[in-house]
């Protein structure tokens, strides 16, 4: 059996190449059926995301999996081997297993530690299962990759730290308030980043979202996204005493919130803490507001520094994750080696059982018939002898299976017991 993973990713190909090779979800069943129908192909999986397209195959030893993939791509995509060849990576055997485990664990992602790739792998796995393209060893390998990803996330902190500006805002809010349950959010402006930050805050327990914008219709539209309340722009400062978290991202060319206004807001809040997130450029909130007690103001640069710090920490965790992945690859390879000698072990056990059964039959003809109790005792005795005889060579077979120079020892056991290849 051969294992091959061929593909392109954000590391090897620009988006123009990746989009040429991408498979839409509705086209996967037909593509997988075509791939599975190729002579010598045992199993196949196609993973297609924004950042990578990968084809995983197991084939019979007699065929060339690289040629199969090249011909498949030429049938399904309007690309030539010459144009995509420089961007393709190909991993075989152990390297393919290592690559798959790294992809599942998000060590090969554009943002290391992001969880989306594992979900995308599971979708690809389900699609292959549904159309009968997975039914054997590759099926088990894919399942194992999910377990490896789970282990990496549980034993390292690779996915615990915010690495987007919008989520960094949520992380900081938690540090300020502890729990975000029942906190009130106001969005000033209708930018994408403020929408993402508000969405994260809502999912983290924020109870209500006010939205204001110079164009009131846009405030109404965004408020619907969060089951929130649109507020007239002229009234938003009057609403601030009710707000715990303010996200400012309006396109105003000047400050829309000044220190003296904020002083009145904090007094009205009886000095309860307030978190201000200014992700506008130019900034919306006067920086001097940060001098006030119980006010925590962060601008886009502050949030980016949090992200950069977290990315550095993630990369430290990634080193630990790489060690875990290598350990899991070693385990998988050991299992594969043992699986290779399983037919030899079965053949040995069958041969010894045949000898035992034949000798038992001779004893029955010569000294029988036996009582049920005698028969049971003889069966137990002879099976025990056979098991003891088999224990040594079976243990040696399993031991030698995991060694690069184990083939001569395995061949010697075959010869000693007259086992056929």
Curated annotation (Swiss-Prot):
Residues the record lists as binding substrate: 49-52, 109, 114-116, 120
Which EC number(s) does UniProt give?
1.2.1.70
UniProt pathway: Porphyrin-containing compound metabolism; protoporphyrin-IX biosynthesis; 5-aminolevulinate from L-glutamyl-tRNA(Glu): step 1/2
Q: Where is this site: Important for activity?
A: 99
Q: Which gene encodes it?
A: hemA
Q: What is this protein called?
A: Glutamyl-tRNA reductase
Primary role: Catalyzes the NADPH-dependent reduction of glutamyl-tRNA(Glu) to glutamate 1-semialdehyde (GSA).
**Statement: the UniProt record of this protein carries the keyword Transcription regulation:** no
Q: Which residues form the active site?
A: 50 (nucleophile)
